[in-house]
């Protein structure tokens, strides 16, 4: 999954230091950098990409820039969303208080420094 960001260095710092993600890939690529991060123990990675002509075809750059600061549609599962909320809040992460959903579980919203939004959910 690709998450478009304005500054890869800032994004890597946030995802690794604040969210505790592992840096899976960080290498030069096409004049830029290819960076992938993942929650600890996960096989699924997020590619943190600056939307510029180095990594994308020129005709896709503007649309990708418009994706920065929007909902990613990505959900992460937590066994203990309330403890996760407290831990992330202490680290200065922009996170909403977990709210119980109609289906019985809880959900929080997290924003990265660019305003890209993710959901954290837990089972009822």
Annotate each language-model stretch with its function.
Residues 9-10, 83:
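Alpha-helical macromolecular-interaction surfaces
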Residues 4-8, 102:
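Conserved beta-strand-loop-alpha-helix junction that forms the acyl-donor binding cleft
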Residues 7, 112-115:
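Conserved phosphate-binding and hydrolysis motifs of nucleotide-dependent enzymes
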């Amino acid at each position: 999954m690709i998450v478009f960001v304005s500054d890869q260095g800032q994004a890597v710092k946030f995802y690794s230091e604040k969210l505790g993600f592992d840096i899976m890939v960080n290498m030069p690529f096409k004049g830029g950098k290819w960076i992938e991060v993942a929650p600890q123990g996960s096989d699924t990675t997020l590619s943190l990409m600056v939307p510029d002509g180095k990594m994308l075809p020129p005709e896709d750059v503007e649309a990708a820039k418009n994706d920065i600061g929007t909902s990613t549609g990505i959900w992460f599962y937590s066994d203990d969303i309330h403890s996760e909320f407290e831990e992330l809040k202490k680290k200065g992460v922009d996170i909403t208080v977990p709210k119980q959903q109609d289906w019985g579980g809880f959900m929080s919203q997290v924003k990265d420094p660019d305003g890209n939004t993710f959901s954290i959910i837990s089972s009822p």
